UniProtKB/Swiss-Prot annotation:
Name used for this protein in its record: Tyrosine recombinase XerD
Record-level Gene Ontology MF annotations: DNA binding; tyrosine-based site-specific recombinase activity
Primary role: Site-specific tyrosine recombinase, which acts by catalyzing the cutting and rejoining of the recombining DNA molecules. The XerC-XerD complex is essential to convert dimers of the bacterial chromosome into monomers to permit their segregation at cell division. It also contributes to the segregational stability of plasmids.
First-listed, main subcellular location of the protein, grouped into a coarse class: cytoplasm
GO BP, sorted A to Z: cell division; chromosome segregation; DNA recombination; DNA transposition; resolution of DNA recombination intermediates
UniProt key word DNA-binding: yes
GO cellular component terms, semicolon-separated: cytoplasm; Holliday junction resolvase complex
Pfam family, one: Phage_int_SAM_1
Key word Cell membrane present: no
Description of how the protein assembles with itself and partners: Forms a cyclic heterotetrameric complex composed of two molecules of XerC and two molecules of XerD.
Sequence ranges assigned to domain Tyr recombinase in this UniProt record: 111-294
Species of origin: Shewanella oneidensis (strain ATCC 700550 / JCM 31522 / CIP 106686 / LMG 19005 / NCIMB 14063 / MR-1)
Length: 300
């Protein structure tokens, strides 16, 4: 009979520390939990515990992941989780040496985020029927997402007190508890105002909620539900580009850079703590400029 997996208590202690000291989002904490539990399961199958691990054990686990054909990006994220976890154990004096000290991350090719052209965005945003309460909500969400570059988790969790239509701003508490103010833009303000006055009350019914964009059940919408809504409108618009929940966030950043926005301004709007995270969008913008040059320059 297979032995039931018992999660090492060190994992929960680490996650509790992250939650209380760093203010990380539930999604980030969930990713850490998934990574650490996978490593812990492997160790237990080898008769090892998390606190007894050496560099050879980590390397053996990485070799196992290669054999199991895990993606390099997945292993890179896992190594980041392990580094933070073992640094916590070191700082709290639960281990005497860091098994991650000489472990290198796999080299990754810089993946350009999937994005949409400006004409594709126009087609996508034109699809929702604003006479229908659900699609009126979706129209406002799409316009706001493209205007602000919010993460989908930030959009679906948006509350009324975070938004000032008079000032045209949304106040976001992003990763690590960092606050940022993001301009909404006139078109997004118009669509959100229309939604608030004509459709939101129909979705809420008699339920009181501070959530700006409730689901049909008057609850906070999930990221997965909104992703499915995006794919629905993309299909109706005849857009065949592979979409992700962050497609409009990527389009927001790329289109700003295409129109001459300063990289550090885009960094602030996106809520990136590291400029290098934002810089990948310059590659997207540059690729688009090269494409336009080849299409339209007489010697392209």
């Amino acid at each position: 009979m297979a032995k039931t997996y018992q999660c090492d208590p060190l994992i929960d202690a680490f996650l509790d520390d992250l939650w209380s000291s760093k203010g990380l989002s539930d999604n980030t904490l969930s990713a850490y939990r998934t990574d650490l539990r996978h490593f812990d399961r492997y160790l237990q199958s080898q008769g090892l515990r998390l606190r007894d691990v050496g560099q050879a054990d980590v390397r053996a686990y990485l070799a196992y992941r290669v054999e199991q054909q895990f993606a390099r990006t997945s292993s890179a994220r896992l190594l980041s989780s392990l580094r933070r976890f073992y640094n916590y154990l070191l700082q709290t004096k639960q281990i005497s040496g860091d098994p991650m000290a000489q472990i290198e991350s796999p080299k990754l090719s810089r993946h350009l985020p999937d994005s949409l052209s400006e004409s594709q965005v126009d087609r996508l945003l034109a699809e929702p029927n604003v006479d229908d309460p659900v699609e009126c909500r979706d129209k406002a969400m799409l316009e706001l997402l493209y205007a602000t570059g919010l993460r989908v988790s930030e959009l679906v969790g948006l509350t009324m007190e975070q938004m000032s239509l008079r000032q045209g701003l949304v106040r976001i508490i992003g990763k690590g508890g960092k606050e940022r103010l993001v301009p909404m833009g006139e078109m997004a303000i118009t669509e959100v105002e229309h939604y608030l006055t004509s459709a939101r009350h129909e979705l809420l019914g008699h339920i009181q909620s501070d959530v700006v964009f409730p689901s049909k059940r008057s609850q906070m919408m999930t990221r997965q539900t909104f992703w499915h809504r995006i794919k629905l409108y993309a299909s109706r618009a005849g857009i065949e580009t592979e979409l992700s929940p962050h497609t409009l966030r990527h389009a927001f950043a790329t289109h700003l850079l295409n129109h001459g926005a300063d990289l550090r301004v885009v960094q602030l709007l996106l809520g990136h703590s590291d400029l290098s995270t934002t810089q990948i969008y310059t590659h997207v913008a540059r690729a688009r400029l090269q494409e336009l040059h080849q299409q339209h320059h007489p010697r392209g």
